[in-house]
């Protein structure tokens, strides 16, 4: 991997793993609920691709800040880390939501109940 100051490629790999896990669980959820549609699959893949693109853009900006003086002020900001943490939080909440949808018995458990469809609709 290329060395870019401030960019953790381990973080990128972890977030990509979360994206794949969310995708697999989302497909499983669709099959379990009988609502599998290729249009939803394409929309979900586009969303995942956009997350990856935003992370790569943040890494590119961090690299650009080290070689192009007009944007050197960006070099002090942890852009990639902030974006990666944000995407990871979105993916983790989606993974938990998919798990609860696949196994509705979890919806009554104290922690998992926050991620059930009923809890989301009541907010």
Per-segment meaning from a language model:
Residues 1-9:
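Short, strongly hydrophobic alpha-helical membrane anchors
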Residues 8-12, 46-50, 77-87, 97:
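Alpha-helical transmembrane segments of integral membrane proteins
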Residues 14-40:
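Membrane-interface helix-loop junction between the first two transmembrane segments
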Residues 15-25, 51-59, 83-94:
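Alpha-helical transmembrane segments of multi-pass membrane proteins
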Residues 28-32, 56-69:
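Membrane-helix exit/interface motif
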Residues 36-51:
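Juxtamembrane helix-capping/reentrant segments at transmembrane boundaries
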Residues 73, 87-123:
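Membrane-proximal cytosolic segments adjacent to transmembrane helices
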